[in-house]
Swiss-Prot record:
InterPro entries reported for this sequence: Ribosomal_eS7
MF terms in GO: structural constituent of ribosome
GO cellular-component term (any): cytosolic small ribosomal subunit
Domain of life: Eukaryota
Name by which UniProt lists this protein: Small ribosomal subunit protein eS7
Amino acid sequence: MLNKKIIKPAGKVATEFENTVAQALVDLENNNAELKDLKDLSVCSVKEVDVAESKKAVVIFVPFRQLKNYNKIQQKLTYEVEKKLGGKQVMFIAQRRIIRKPASNNKIKMQKRPISRTIKAVHDAILDDLVFPNTIVGRRLRYRLDGSKLHKIYLDRKEMLSNISKVDSFSAVYHKLTGKEVVFEFTQQTAEN
């Protein structure tokens, strides 16, 4: 049953931690009536990211075509998987591939690169998957005096109470996956007349 839950490329073997997460998903699929939709869903890989000295986050990569199905049950599924993994924060991200920019000196004609496979599109999609079900309402790119960049991401204030504890995890996971430094903030409440 675990072999069907984890999809790996030929020749790759699932790690012990990936098997643990897959077993947790199988248990939830069998025991929880609300999560019966998990039967058709699978996992590509699982990574564990250090957030702070004692905090860890778990990133579960799912096939791109199954992301919408995961999103339908994601809030309940995240809560249940976090309980099974001992309180580690869980995030679901679609497995995407970046195709590099074709070199100008390449004599062989290459296939055109789709916009969805560019590095910017993939990094933006990872960001959207990371903060789901919250929505990103604004982005700012700040250039520091030393030349480094800081991305400021503004999240919707409606989901602030449920996501305020996850903001550190969001930035640590995004930095680990993309190498970009990110700060998440919630929008300011404006006075309505």
